[in-house]
Amino acid sequence: MPKHSKRYNEIRKLVDSEKAYTLDEAVELLKKTATAKFDETVEFHIKTNIDYRKSEQNIRSTISLPHGTGKSVRVLVFAKGEKAEEAKQAGADYVGAEELADKIANEGFVDFDVAIATPDMMKVIGKLGKVLGPRGLMPNPKTGTVTEDIAAAVSEFKKGKVEVRTDKTGNLHFPVGKASFEPDKLKENIKSAYEQILSLRPAGVKGHFIKKAVVATTMGPGIKLDLNVLAEGKR
């Protein structure tokens, strides 16, 4: 077992691993356990009841947080002509076509958080799957990153739109803010994220969709949420 620091062991005592906390209690604990020297990210970990062996049950989508993630999001756009100009006007950090694809393919350039493309660019970026795919950066219609409405997509991701996808065991992990956020903003982000995840329930899931939900700061212990009260008991 990994050896934890003295700091971690001290804050670990604040959290009862057997207890399921209300959202108010959980956010209060998030504040108390965020003791690192940097502004820790608040992470949401959700254990689902999907059968991850069935591809139709795996989730890949996006959610929008009311108050964003608190992180500066670097957006790259594959587009030409008028669409490229729209991307620049909307605040995209990198805009280009073949030359940008070549930079990624030949130089391994991946200094960005989101990649968006117009549909006509898919033939250009098809070769980038091996580089972008494993990093979760490959544009995909399911996540709104292959679109004609480039300006709206750039704006949404800049404001805090978050991609969510189940991992190899059917669980979800994504940011919902920073430890420095005001308590009410953290609560609103967490509650909104949970409700949006509920709406993504695959048709074939039997019983409860959500088995467990935990929030934690980057360097802090997991805090289990009481699902009986989080969204009026919806799971």
UniProtKB/Swiss-Prot annotation:
<dbReference type="GO" id="GO:0015934">
    <property type="term" value="C:large ribosomal subunit"/>
</dbReference>
<dbReference type="GO" id="GO:0003735">
    <property type="term" value="F:structural constituent of ribosome"/>
</dbReference>
<keyword id="KW-0699">rRNA-binding</keyword>
<dbReference type="InterPro" id="IPR028364">
    <property type="entry name" value="Ribosomal_uL1/biogenesis"/>
</dbReference>
<dbReference type="InterPro" id="IPR005878">
    <property type="entry name" value="Ribosom_uL1_bac-type"/>
</dbReference>
<dbReference type="InterPro" id="IPR023674">
    <property type="entry name" value="Ribosomal_uL1-like"/>
</dbReference>
<dbReference type="GO" id="GO:0019843">
    <property type="term" value="F:rRNA binding"/>
</dbReference>
<comment type="function">
    <text>Binds directly to 23S rRNA. The L1 stalk is quite mobile in the ribosome, and is involved in E site tRNA release.</text>
</comment>
<keyword id="KW-0678">Repressor</keyword>
<dbReference type="GO" id="GO:0006417">
    <property type="term" value="P:regulation of translation"/>
</dbReference>
<keyword id="KW-0689">Ribosomal protein</keyword>
<keyword id="KW-0820">tRNA-binding</keyword>
<protein>
    <recommendedName>
        <fullName>Large ribosomal subunit protein uL1</fullName>
    </recommendedName>
</protein>
<dbReference type="InterPro" id="IPR002143">
    <property type="entry name" value="Ribosomal_uL1"/>
</dbReference>
<keyword id="KW-0694">RNA-binding</keyword>
<comment type="similarity">
    <text>Belongs to the universal ribosomal protein uL1 family.</text>
</comment>
<comment type="subunit">
    <text>Part of the 50S ribosomal subunit.</text>
</comment>
<dbReference type="GO" id="GO:0006412">
    <property type="term" value="P:translation"/>
</dbReference>
<dbReference type="Pfam" id="PF00687">
    <property type="entry name" value="Ribosomal_L1"/>
</dbReference>
<keyword id="KW-0810">Translation regulation</keyword>
<keyword id="KW-0687">Ribonucleoprotein</keyword>
<dbReference type="InterPro" id="IPR016095">
    <property type="entry name" value="Ribosomal_uL1_3-a/b-sand"/>
</dbReference>
<dbReference type="GO" id="GO:0000049">
    <property type="term" value="F:tRNA binding"/>
</dbReference>
<comment type="function">
    <text>Protein L1 is also a translational repressor protein, it controls the translation of the L11 operon by binding to its mRNA.</text>
</comment>
<dbReference type="InterPro" id="IPR023673">
    <property type="entry name" value="Ribosomal_uL1_CS"/>
</dbReference>
